[in-house]
């Protein structure tokens, strides 16, 4: 029996209309097919499967190994299947002899398809990175998975799980002011975004993204982001970019001194591919 808490998300609509191209026909039979498609915002469509970090429990599978392995495989299979329609799910699988609790979460700007593509990589990756550990957390840039066996002793792990600060530092171009302004909006933003704790904003030349674990209430989410901002300020200092991963939330920022690249996250860029077939006439 599995206990579940899933939150569903609608997949964004994409205009797939096509525009025909007309060319003159001179002594040839011209057949063409032209189809247009949209390339979504780069952050939402790519770069979500890069490994950020992983942590593995010290305890490993012991007798009965087969029972634990089967239970864990069942849990990972369920988490993967749920990611087809949800961006967050947590549940437990097993009985008194072998039970596992687990969850996954996808980044708030990923479509259902990209969420599934991201999560489906995690079972094999966690097996390769953590082997027979009774607990693991594997974080990709677009999603993460976490699981542990019932009865595994929890380490008093710090609130900060992982940080990555750019070695490049910003010069005197108003960076501190713009980043401070962006950080100031985070706590309120995750509370009022209406997007289940996901927040993305641009302040001047600073692009910022923040997300809380979906089972946090508004106050817990706000507190998590306040702590993440403090870590970013203390640890990343003047770095032009930083990624902060807390126990139940994440914060990232990037400073673009030459201006944020122009992208259209709603409509994407339209391309048209044409295929031609020429049938010539011979005398």
For each predicted feature, which ranges?
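Extracellular secretory-pathway ectodomains and N-terminal mature segments of eukaryotic proteins
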Residues: 2-283
